[in-house]
């Protein structure tokens, strides 16, 4: 069942905060977003379940810039990190509704943007207020060279609004207060933008091959980290062992 976790229950409502509810009458509830006239929201491609007639969906190139440069950048990110070239923008010419569902079973965390900004790992993005902004940031190629789990780019938020991130499995929030935390990259959902982080192979390349451990993130400083309880790549590998092959 999908759940929404509010990260700051005491914070005041802001004008551009996303208004959304969870339909809990279903075994796997949907996120339903209320859009006012002229309102918009960015959403994960393929996450739309339904919308009212005054809501329109438009596909946009995923990234900043314009023209050929933006197209080349989107193609390049898609080739090297597996990230989608496109993002969907929903716009409303009146009061409307839009329902979304993540592509994996798990939880949804609502992150309020303003004083706090976040970075998202690959596959964690679900929706973002149209009043907020995001950019795709290139990671140090040495950090992500052997990744396959987070890619060479991460999404970084800017501005005011609400971000919805989704997980595979349950979400746990970790708060760092000047310390250090090492986390398997496949379990990282999102983290505070002000945190320093380093992506590398656990114990080096050969040791990682021998132990089966993959890419890890080491975070330092003050901020929040959201992790997921399940590893999508390991889950896919488990299922693969039971799938028939052409030789069977």
From Swiss-Prot:
**Top-rank lineage group of the source organism:** Bacteria
- What Pfam families does its record include? AIM24 (PF01987)
Task: Give the matching InterPro entries.
Answer: AIM24, AIM24_sf, Trp_RNA-bd_attenuator-like_dom
Q: Which NCBIfam families is this protein grouped with?
A: TIGR00266 family protein
> What is the name attached to this protein's record?
Uncharacterized protein M6_Spy0233
């Amino acid at each position: 069942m999908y759940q929404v976790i509010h990260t700051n229950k005491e914070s005041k409502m802001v004008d551009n905060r996303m208004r959304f509810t969870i339909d809990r009458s279903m075994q796997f509830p949907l996120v339903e977003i209320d859009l006012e006239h002229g309102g918009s929201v960015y959403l994960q491609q393929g996450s739309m379940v339904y919308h009212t007639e005054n809501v329109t969906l438009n596909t946009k190139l995923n990234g900043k810039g314009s023209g050929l440069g933006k197209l080349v950048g989107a193609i390049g990110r898609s080739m090297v990190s597996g990230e989608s070239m496109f993002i969907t923008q929903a716009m409303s010419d009146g009061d409307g509704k839009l329902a979304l569902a993540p592509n994996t079973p798990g939880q949804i965390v609502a992150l309020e943007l303003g004083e706090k900004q976040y970075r998202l790992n690959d596959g964690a993005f679900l929706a973002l207020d149209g009043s907020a902004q995001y950019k795709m940031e290139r990671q140090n190629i040495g950090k992500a060279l052997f990744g396959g789990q987070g890619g060479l780019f991460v999404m970084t938020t800017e501005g005011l609004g609400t971000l919805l991130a989704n997980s595979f499995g349950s979400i746990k929030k970790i708060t760092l207060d000047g310390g250090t935390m090492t986390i398997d990259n496949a379990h990282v959902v999102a983290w505070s933008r002000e945190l320093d982080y380093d992506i590398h192979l656990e114990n080096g390349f050969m040791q990682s091959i021998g132990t089966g451990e993959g890419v890890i993130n080491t975070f330092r400083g003050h901020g929040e980290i959201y992790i997921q309880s399940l590893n999508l790549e390991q889950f896919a590998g488990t299922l693969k062992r039971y799938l028939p092959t052409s030789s069977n």
